[in-house]
Swiss-Prot record:
Active site (record annotation): 34, 152
Tissue occurrence: Hyphal tip.
InterPro entries linked to this entry: GH45_Enzymes, Glyco_hydro_45, RlpA-like_sf
Glycosites: 343
Protein name, UniProt field: Endoglucanase 1
Length: 393
C-alpha cells in the first residue's frame, strides 16, 4: 500500500511540474517601475549606435554617458535615473496595440539590449479581456530573477521591486506611496500620489492594460519603430536585418531606418507632440518632488516575498550599502558592476562583437561591496538580473 501511495504521489508531482513548465513557456508580463538606470544605458553592453538614455533626477535632462562614464545609478546612490519618457503609449491607428519598454530574459544581453519584440496576450491574470492586447516593446533591461520567457514591463506605479530606494531618491516621494513593493498601486486613484510626470502612465495600466497578462506564444523580434527609439535613444546595429511589424500603425510607429536620427521632442512634449502628457517637462504639481535626491522614505525594503512569475535571481548579489537590505523579499538581481571597479569580479573590458563594436563582458561574479542597480544599476560587467516587479493582486 505504501509503495502504491508513493508511486501515486510521484505521478502527481510530475504532473504538477509539467503544468508549471507549461505556464513558464506560455509566459506572462509582470511589471515594475524602480527609477533605476537601465542596464542598456551602459556603454559596451551591446552593438548599438548609442546606449539607452540616462536622465538626471528631473527625469528629462539627459546625462551624456561618454562624458560621465563613472556615474552610478540612482538606485546605488548615484545621479543617473530612468527617463520619465519611457512609459507605455498607444498606437492611434490600431486600438489594440501599445508600445513600451522593459526587461526580457531570453538570450544574452548583448543580443537583446535595445532589440524590439512583438507580443500578443490572451487575457490578464484574472482572466479579464484587455483593451490593448498587442504590444511592441524594446528591451532595456536584463531580468535575472524573471522566469524564462516572461517579460517585465515598465509601468509607473507597477512596483519598486527589488530596488525600492531608487524612486524615493529621484522624486522625494516615500516608498509607501508607490504601492506594494511587488505590484505597485492597486487603483488609478492611487496614481495621483505619484510624481506628476508619471501619473498618466500609471493610470494607463487600469484603462488599457491589465494585471500580469498571459502571453499568447513567445514574443517575436521585430524591427524597432521610430517611436521607441525616439524615447530611448537606442538602436541596434543589426536592426536593419530584422523584418518590421506587419500590422497597420500610425506614421510615428513605423519601423526606423538604419542609423535613425531620433526625435527627442517627443519626450520634451510629454511623450506626445503638442500635448503635456506622461514623462514630459510638465513636472509641476502635486507630488512631483522635483529633483530631490534625498532618498526619503526607503520603507518596505524586503517586506514582501518573491512574487509569481519570477525564478531564482542570477548575477550579482545586491549587498551594497545602498540596497543591501532592500532585496531580502525579492532576491538579488543585477550583477551589473564592471570587473574594472574595485569590487567587481568579472572582466572589465568589453569584448568585440562581430561588427567590431563592443559587447557585454562575460557573465558571472558578484559585487558584495557596491550595491548593484536593478535595471543595470552599475557598470557593464557580469550580466544578470535587473530588478523585478510585482505580484498579482
Amino acid at each position: 500500500m505504501a509503495f502504491k501511495l508513493n508511486i501515486g504521489l510521484l505521478a502527481l508531482s510530475l504532473s504538477l511540474s509539467l503544468v508549471h513548465l507549461d505556464g513558464v513557456r506560455a509566459g506572462m508580463a509582470t511589471r515594475y517601475w524602480d527609477c533605476c538606470l537601465a542596464s542598456a544605458s551602459w556603454e559596451g553592453k551591446a552593438p548599438v549606435y548609442a546606449p539607452v538614455d540616462a536622465c538626471k533626477a528631473d527625469g528629462v535632462t539627459l546625462i551624456d554617458s561618454k562624458k560621465d562614464p563613472s556615474g552610478q545609478s540612482g538606485c546605488n546612490g548615484g545621479n543617473k535615473f530612468m527617463c520619465s519618457c519611457m512609459q507605455p503609449f498607444d498606437d492611434e491607428t490600431d486600438p489594440t496595440l501599445a508600445f513600451g519598454f522593459g526587461a526580457f530574459t531570453t538570450g544574452q544581453e548583448s543580443d537583446t539590449d535595445c532589440a524590439c519584440f512583438y507580443a500578443e496576450f490572451e487575457h490578464d491574470a484574472q482572466g479579464k479581456a484587455m483593451k490593448r492586447n498587442k504590444l511592441i516593446f524594446q528591451v532595456t533591461n536584463v531580468g535575472g530573477d524573471v522566469q524564462s520567457q516572461n517579460f517585465d514591463f515598465q509601468i509607473p506605479g507597477g512596483g519598486l521591486g527589488a530596488f525600492p530606494k531608487g524612486c524615493p531618491a529621484q522624486w522625494g516621494v516615500e516608498a509607501s506611496l508607490w504601492g506594494d513593493q511587488y505590484g505597485g498601486v492597486k487603483s488609478a486613484t492611487e496614481c495621483s500620489k505619484l510624481p506628476k510626470p508619471l501619473q498618466e502612465g500609471c493610470k494607463w495600466r487600469f484603462s488599457e492594460w491589465g494585471d500580469n497578462p498571459v502571453l499568447k506564444g513567445s514574443p517575436k523580434r521585430v524591427k524597432c519603430p521610430k517611436s521607441l527609439i525616439d524615447r530611448s535613444g537606442c538602436q541596434r546595429k543589426d536592426d536593419n536585418t530584422i523584418s518590421p511589424y506587419s500590422g497597420k500603425v500610425d506614421s510615428a510607429n513605423t519601423a526606423a531606418p538604419a542609423q535613425y536620427k531620433r526625435d527627442r521632442s517627443v519626450c520634451l512634449a510629454g511623450g506626445k507632440k503638442g500635448k503635456s502628457a506622461a514623462g514630459g517637462v510638465d513636472g509641476s504639481g502635486d507630488a512631483s518632488g522635483g529633483a530631490d535626491a534625498s532618498g526619503a522614505g526607503g520603507a518596505a525594503e524586503g517586506s514582501q516575498g518573491q512574487p509569481e512569475g519570477y525564478g531564482q535571481p542570477s548575477g550579482g548579489n545586491d549587498q551594497g550599502s545602498s540596497n543591501g537590505d532592500a532585496t531580502t523579499g525579492a532576491g538579488s538581481g543585477s550583477g551589473s558592476d564592471s570587473g574594472s571597479t574595485a569590487n567587481g569580479s568579472g572582466s572589465g573590458a568589453p569584448t568585440s562583437g562581430s561588427d567590431g563594436s563592443a559587447v557585454a563582458p562575460p557573465s558571472g561574479g558578484s559585487n558584495p561591496g557596491a550595491a548593484q542597480g536593478g535595471q543595470g544599476g552599475a557598470q557593464p560587467g557580469p550580466s544578470g538580473g535587473h530588478k523585478k516587479c510585482h505580484k498579482k493582486h
